[in-house]
UniProtKB/Swiss-Prot annotation:
Pfam family, one: IBV_3A
Protein's job: Involved in resistance to IFN.
Keywords annotated in UniProt: Host-virus interaction, Inhibition of host innate immune response by virus, Interferon antiviral system evasion, Signal, Viral immunoevasion
Keyword Signal: yes
Signal peptide: 1-23
UniProt name for this protein: Non-structural protein 3a
Superkingdom, taxonomy of origin: Viruses
Keyword Signal annotated: yes
GO BP, sorted A to Z: symbiont-mediated suppression of host innate immune response
Naturally occurring in which organism (per UniProt): Avian infectious bronchitis virus (strain UK/183/66) (IBV)
InterPro entries (alphabetical): IBV_3A
Amino acid sequence: MIQSPTSFLIVLILLWCKLVISCFRECIVALQQLIQVLLQIINSNLQSRLLLWHSLD
């Protein structure tokens, strides 16, 4: 079964697109986790500051 160069190129491009999409998806998941961690840190900082302000009053 000999394929023409154009169909081979199309298969290569499709595989490359699949790879890019999967990498992109993993990057998005990693970014979401990073954002959640940052939000948790910010929340804990805000809560501790609020507690400090209340204790000063």
